Amino acid sequence: MAEASQLFKEFKIQSVSEFFRRNAAMLGYTGKIRSLTTVVHEAVTNSLDACEEAGILPYVRVEIEELGREHYKVIVEDNGPGIPEKFITHVFGKMLAGTKAHRNIQSRGQQGIGISGAVMFAQITSGKATRVITSTGGDIIEAWVKIDVDKNEGKIVKKERHPNPKGWRGTRIELEVKNVRYVRSKQGVYWYLKLTAIANPHAHIELIEPDGKLIVFPRSSEEVPKPPVEMKPHPKGVLTDDVYRMAKKTRRNTVRRFLIGEFSRISDKKVDELIKYIAALRLIKTEKDKAVQDQLYERLMNGEVDKVLRSFKGYTKVVKQVAKLMEKPPEKLSWHEAEEIVEAFKYMKFLAPPTHGLRPIGEENIEKGLKGILKPEFVTAVTRPPKVYSGGIPFQVEVGLAYGGEISSGFDLLRYANRVPLLFDAGSCVTTLAARSIDWKRYKVDDLERAPVVLMINVISVHVPYTGTGKQSIANVDEIHNEIRLAIMDAARRLQTYLSGKHRRLYQVKRKKTFEKYVPEIAKALSILTGEPEEEVKNYFLRFIEERFAQSEVEAEEVAENA
C-alpha cells in the first residue's frame, strides 16, 4: 500500500490562470472560427465599455492581418480614455480582475476574465506577448504583456515611452494567434461586428479584413448611452456568504446600519420586522413535533409572524436576544448569524428591487440600428418594463423586429445580452426557446424559415444568468422566458398590422388595374350610346376609380388604427 507522503508527492496548487490555460474552451476558445471571434469580442467589448464609461462616442477599428496558415494578427484600436500605466498588467495579465466584476452593475463583461483570457490564448498558441499601446493624454506607453500563469499575474517583458504632442488618448492592442481561421460565416468576426453595430448605433466600427477590404459600420446615433448605475443587492437575491463577506468589509458600525445601508428595500422598520422573523425561526426549530413545525413554517410564510411568536412562551426573551444581534459590530457577525438573516429574508416580503440602474438600448435606437445596417422595409421595437428573476435580480427585455427590404429570405435571430452579440450555443438559449414558442402564423408569417424576418432580442441585467463561462447562452429562467414572449408578441402584432395593410394594398392595386383595364371598352360603348366624346367618358371613369380607391384606403387605415 502506498504511503500518504507518496500519494501527495505530486500535489500542486493550481492558479486561476493555469486552470483556464488548461480549460480554454470554458472561455469560448473552441474551434478555429469561434476562437478568433472570441478574441475580437473580448477586445471590442473592453473598448465599448471604456468609451461609454468616459462619455465618449466610440470609434473602434479592428484589423485582421494574415501572417500564415491559420496564423493571424488581431489589432483593435479605440478612442477611449486610455489605461493608466500602473494598471496595464492588471487589465491584460490578471484573471478575475477588472472594474466591474465586483460591482452590482449592468455591464458587457461580468467575470473579469475576458481580455486577459484573450492575451493568454495568444500566448499559448503563438508564444508571443501582446503589444499594448495606450495613453490617457500624457506620454504614450508601449508595452508587451505576458501572463505568468503560475502566479496569475501579468508581466511586462518590454516597455517603451513615447512623447504625445497631439494629446492622443485611447488604446491599441495587437495579439498574435495561431490555430484560428477567418471566414465570413455567421459565427465569424464580420458577423459579430455587424451585430455589435446594430445594438450599438452610437458606435462607429471599422473592420479591415485579411484581404485588405475595409468595411465600415457608421454610427446612426450621436447620443452616448447613460452609464448604468450601481445597485445595492436585494435581500431576496443574496446568499449567506454574500451577507457574511459584506459584513466583514462594511464601514457601518452596527448590523442594523449595515443592513439598511448596504441593501435595497431595507429600512429601520424592516429591520424590526427581521428581528421578529429570526426570533420566530429560532423558536420554531425548538418544536419537536414535525407536523406542528411544518404548520408554523407555513404560517410564517403567510406573514403571521406575530401569531407564531405568541404561540411560544417566553418569546419576548428571544426577540430581545435577536435585537442585541442587530446592534453588534458587523465584523463580529458569525456565519450562523448571517445564515439566520438570509433564512429570514426568504420568509419576508420586500418591494421589488429598484431598476433605475438598468440601461436598455431603447426602442428608437434599436430601430435606428436595424434600419442603418439591414435596410428593411418595416421595423419596430419593444422595450418591456423592468422585472425581477430569482426573487431579487432585476432584468429587462427588449426586442427589435425587421421585415423585407434588403433582408434576404430566411429567419434570423439576433441574440444579445447587455448589447453583446451571442453567436454560439443558440439551441439552449432562452431567447431561441422563446422565439420558437411563438405561433408566427397568427401574425401572418406563414413560413417563418423562408420569410425575410430578423428578430433581435436583448436581455439586460446586472447578473445575466449565462449557462457557462463562455457567456454565449442565457439560461431558461421562467421570468425571462415569459418577458421575451410578451415582447415578441407585441412586435409581431405590429408586423401583422403592416402585412395586413400591405396585402390589402396589393389586392386593391390588382382590383384597380382590373377596373382600369375595361375602361376603354366601356367609354367607347357609352360614347356611342350618349354621344359624349369618348376621351371625356374615359377620363371621368378613371377619376372615379382613382377617388373611390383612395377613399377605400383612408377608411381601411382608420380601421387599422382603431383596431
UniProtKB/Swiss-Prot annotation:
Domain of life of the native organism: Archaea
Disulfide bridges in this chain: none
Enzyme Commission code: 5.6.2.2
Keywords: ATP-binding, DNA-binding, Isomerase, Nucleotide-binding, Topoisomerase
Keyword NADP: no
Residues where ATP binds: N46, D78, T99, K100, G109, Q110, Q111, G112, I113, G114, I115, S116, K471
Classification via Pfam families: HATPase_c, Topo-VIb_trans
Catalytic activity field: ATP-dependent breakage, passage and rejoining of double-stranded DNA
Alphabetical list of InterPro entries matching this protein: HATPase_C_sf, Ribosomal_Su5_D2-typ_SF, Ribsml_uS5_D2-typ_fold_subgr, TopoVI_B, TopoVI_B_transducer
Enzyme class, broadest EC rank: isomerase
Free-text function comment from the UniProt entry: Relaxes both positive and negative superturns and exhibits a strong decatenase activity.
Family: Belongs to the TOP6B family.
Record-given protein name: Type 2 DNA topoisomerase 6 subunit B
Species assigned in the record: Thermococcus onnurineus (strain NA1)
